[in-house]
């Protein structure tokens, strides 16, 4: 589906009350993180998506700039992430939903509930992140990416992106490395940006998400 102008990979399964799922993994926030194979560090042997789909209508997705979803170079923020989730909930036809957030997804679930309390039937926050160490990690990752861009340029990000897979596994590819690796048209536009303007967007994204 295309939501707010960005391709979003999503999966709706099961029946029952709607359960909007915000996956763990930072910039690896993808549907497969809810499965036994893709989410071993969070779920051990349990296939969370299959289990929950027996009781709920599960709505899971690759968050923008993650997995098979696309992206757009703009200052990232919790508001943008909430807008995407709200559009997905509307697409699913759900009037209300329980919210399940894990890791960074717990922060997004809280942000959604604050902005749309009437849509939230309940919150389940698993393995939430936050605090000084989380902030330090985020700032460090953004700094590594920005230093890489200053030294090597944006074309080097596109070249490295398929090997790095995502920002949380290879900080130097940055938050837009995943769509650059998946979508050639995104990569082609990515390299044409003004570097200084891009670095400013990175800094604003870092501060909005981690400060």
Across the structure, where does each feature detected by a protein language model lie?
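Alpha/beta-hydrolase
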Residues: 143-211
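Gly/Ala-rich beta-loop-alpha elbow adjacent to hydrolase catalytic centers
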Residues: 101-105, 109
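Conserved acidic catalytic loop of the alpha/beta-hydrolase fold
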Residues: 79-97
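Conserved HGGG/HGGXW glycine-rich cap/lid loop of the alpha/beta-hydrolase fold
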Residues: 3-70
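Catalytic nucleophile-loop/oxyanion-hole region of alpha/beta-hydrolase
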Residues: 69-82
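Short beta-strand immediately N-terminal to the catalytic nucleophile in serine-hydrolase-like folds
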Residues: 81, 99-101, 126
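Flexible "cap/lid" loop of the alpha/beta hydrolase fold
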Residues: 110, 114-115, 120-151
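Active-site acidic short loop of glycosyltransferases
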Residues: 14-16, 93-95, 117
